[in-house]
From Swiss-Prot:
Name this protein carries in UniProt: Uncharacterized protein Mb2668
Domain of life the protein comes from: Bacteria
Organism: Mycobacterium bovis (strain ATCC BAA-935 / AF2122/97)
Ranges of biased composition (kind: Polar residues): 11-21
The keyword Signal belongs to this UniProt entry's keyword annotation: yes
The entry's keywords: Signal
Region (Disordered): 1-21
Signal peptide from the UniProt entry: 1-20
């Protein structure tokens, strides 16, 4: 039963599921496409999907500034 759960999570069999990289940091496909993820309740899913898809990098390229000028805490990244 436990081995089947580990295979379903796609984790390494020699480590428990809570210590895998997917449990600590979900992959980009989970952030973009998994609507049922627990990150969605904290707003992390929406902000991180914008960062992964390159919205912040595009805003940096338009504003000709460093990437720290883009505010990733708001729902829509704005240029300072």
């Amino acid at each position: 039963m436990v081995a089947a759960d580990h295979r379903a999570l796609g984790s390494n069999k020699s480590y428990p599921a809570s210590q895998t990289a997917e449990a600590i940091w979900p992959p980009a496909r989970t952030l973009r496409y998994d609507r049922q993820s627990p990150w969605l309740a904290t707003g992390f899913d929406r902000r991180m999907s914008q960062t992964v898809t390159g919205v912040g990098v595009q805003n940096c390229a338009v504003s000709k500034r460093r990437c720290s000028a883009v505010d990733h805490s708001s729902r829509t990244p704005y240029r300072r």
